[in-house]
Amino acid sequence: MQRVFILTLSLVMLLTMDVKSRESAIEAVDTENLRVCADPSNLPFSNEKGEGFENAIADLLGEKLNIPVVYEYFPQVIGYVRNTLNKKKCDILIGITAGNDLVLNTIPYMRWSYGMIFLKENGIEVDRPNHPQLADLSIGVQAGTPPTFVLQRYNLMGRVRPYNLTFDPRKAVIGESMIEDLIDGLVDIVFMSGPIAVYYLEKKGYDKSKYQFIPLETTDQGWGRMDYYTTMGV
C-alpha cells in the first residue's frame, strides 16, 4: 500500500511539473506579437519613438511575420540581456554583438568599428593612433571603452577629456555630448563608435565633406577588438 501511495504521489508531482513547464513555455512565447527588447535612447540604433535602424529592422520582421511589433525598453547597459531576454520579456534583441554567449546569435548583418573623428576645418592631419600630432590635441573618449587602451598604449591619456561610461541614456546621451564638444572646440578629436559619431555629426549638419573618420584596427598588440559584428539575439 505504501509503495502504491508513493508511486501515485510521484505521478501527481510529475504531472504538476509538466503542467507548470507547459504554462511557462506558453508565457515565454507570444504568437500574437513580435516582442522586441531595445534601448529607449540609443540612436542611430533604437529609441522609444521608433526612429532607429533597429526599429526599422524590427518593423520589417513584423511585416514579414504578419504580426505587430511590441517593445520592452531597457537601457543597453550591464544586465541588459539578463533583465530582458532572460526574463522572457521579449523574443528577440535586434542588435547585439556576435559571439555574446548569453544569447543565440543570428548571422551578422552589420560590421562597425571604433574610430578617430575630427573636423577637417581644423587642419588636423592624424591618420593613425600613433600620429605625433595627437600629443598636442585635446582628445575625447568614453572611459572604459576599447579606444582607451589604444590611448594608454601611446601614452596619450594625459591629453584625454574623459566621458562617463555608466549613465542613464534616458537622461543624457554621451555620444551626442562628445560630438557637441567636438563642434564647440572643447576637444579636437574624439575616439568613439563610428555609427554614433557619424549619426550625430550629420544630425547637426556636418556631411562627409566636413569631417574625417579614421577606423581603428583590431591588432595583436593587446588592446582588444576595435571592430565588431552585429547580430540579432534570441
For each of these PLM feature ranges, what is it?
Residues D59, E63-K64, P68-Q133, S209-M226:
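Acidic, polar ligand-binding/catalytic clefts
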Residues E27, N83-T84, Q133, V150, ...:
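Well-formed, non-transmembrane alpha-helical positions, independent of function
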Residues Y71-D91, R170-Y199, K203-K204:
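Short helices/loops that flank or line small-molecule/ion binding pockets
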